[in-house]
Amino acid sequence: MKKLITHSLGIPLIVVTIFLGCQDMDIVNQNQPDEQRALASPGDLESLIKGSFLSWFDAIQSSTPNMSLAMPSDTYTCGWGNFGMGSLSTEPREILINTSSSGLRGVMEGPWFGLYGAISAATDGIRNIEAGNVTLGDDNERALGFAKLVQGLSHGYIALMFDKGFILDENVDLASGILELVPYTDVMDAAIAQLEAAIAIFNANDFTLPNDWINGKAFTSAELSKLTHSFIARYMALLPRDKTQRAAVNWSSVLTHLDAGLTEDWGVIGDGAGRSSVWYSGTHWYSSQWNVWQRVDYKLIGPSDKSTGYSDWLGKAPADRDEFIMDSGDSRIWDGTLSADGTQNPGSQMLQIGQTTFIRASYGFSRYGHDRFKEVTTSNNAVPIVLFRMSENDFLRAEALMHTGGSTSTIAALLDKTHMGDGGYASTSGLALGSINDAPDPKHDAATLWSVLKYEKNMDLLGTWSGLQYWEKRGWGDLTTGTLIHFPVPAADLETMGLQLYTFGGVGLPGGAPKRRSEIGEDLKEWNLRY
C-alpha cells in the first residue's frame, strides 16, 4: 500500500511519501513547486531560512501546544476549554480523542504541521545551497548553520511531544524517496545529530545574524554555538517517558554540553503588536491575565504551605477540592505581610488574587496568580520573552550530579541560587540527597535535595518554554495518574496514510501515566504528600 501526503504549510509544499509495503512506486509530484523559480534569488533563499526559525517558534510557543501542555502538567490552571486546556486537565484524566473532527485536533496538528513546515523550509534552503542553485557568497555558512539549527530544534520537539515522527533532511528525495514513521528515540537521535552539525558550522566560522532572524538581537556564531549546546542538554534530559529512562540519560554528556552552553538568559524580543504579534508566546501573554485566564495550580505552589491547607486539599477527592489561602513560606508567593484589608501582599513573582471566576470543576480553582511576565502584557508584547533561563542550566547540572554521584555540597550551592535568593529559604546545605521518587518540597523539615530540585525547577521556570514542566514531570514520574505521556500522530495524517487511528491517556489505559505511591496505599505523610 502506498500513499501520497500533501499539506499546505505556507511555504514551498512538502510532499511526503509514506512506505507501507514493498511495492514499486510510481509517483507524480503535482504539488511541489519549481524550487528554482520559488528560490530564484539569494534574497528568496535567505528569507526562507530566516523564516524557518519563526515557524519553529510559532509552532511551539503559540497557544497550542504551549498553553495546552501547561494544564496537564498541573502548573497552571484555567477555566477555558480553548487549546484543549480543559480536556487535558480533567480529573480523573481522560483518554485523548484523536480524530480529524475532534476539538482537540489543533493541539496536535498545530505543532506537527508547523514543525514539519519549519523543517521543510530549512531543508529546502540547505538543498539549494549545497546543489549550487543559489549562492549567498560569504553568508553561505551562516545560512547552512542556521538551517541545521532549525532542523534539529524542530525534530527535537517532535520527539518530545509525539510517540513517533518522520525524519526529513536534505538527503531525502521527496519526489522519489521514502519516509517512514519511526520511534521518538530515533527522531531525537536525528535531532541531536543535526544540532551537532550546526555547532560544527558555528565553531568553524565567525559571523553575526541580522537582528530579525531571532527577533531583537544580532546573535554571533559563538553565541549560537552556546545556545545549541544548551538545547542538546535540555532535549536529552526531557526526552524520557518515565523515571527509569530519566535515570539512564547520558548525564555525563549533558554536563559536557552544559559546560559549552549558555552563559546568559536567552530568548526573543516581542514585536509590540500584542496578541497579534508574530513573536508571541501564549503563557507569557496570558499568565498575568488571571481573572479570566491562567492562575497558578496548587499542585505547583502547595508544597510551600506551612499550614494544613494543602495537605487537607490533597486528602479530598478531586470533586471536593476548592480554593483556599495558603500560609506559604516562599517569598516568591507572599512577602510575609498583610495589607490593610488582610490580603497577603504580593511575593516577587506571584500574588493572592480574588475568588476564581472559572466555570469548571472546583479542583481547578486557585487564589494565586503568576505576574512574573506581566510586562509582556502591559507593554503590548514589546519586551524580552525569556525562553531559556540560566537557572535551567544550574538545575540540569544539579540533576546530572545527582545521577552521577556528584558532590552534594555543589548540588546544594546550585539549588540555593533560587531557593535562598528568590524563595527566601535557608540553605539546602546538609540536606540528604534523597531520590527521584521524592515529591517536590521546599520545607527543610521534610525536604531532600531531590525534593528541593523538583520544587525549585518548576517554580523558577514556570511558563518559560512550551511544555517544559510537562516533560520534566513525565521523566520524574510526577504526572497525575492517567495523563498521556506523549501524543499520537494527528488523525489527519493517519487517515491520509490509511493507518489505524490510535491514542493515549486515561487512567489505566495505554500511554497514561502510572499510579504514584500515594495512590497505592502508602501513608501520605510518609510520602511527603506526593500528589
What are the functions of these language-model segments?
Residues I14-V15, F324, Q349:
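Detector for intrinsically disordered, low-structure N-terminal pre-sequences
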Residues P72-D74, D189, D305, D322, ...:
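Acidic side chains
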Residues T75-S101, T356-F373:
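Short alpha-helical hairpin
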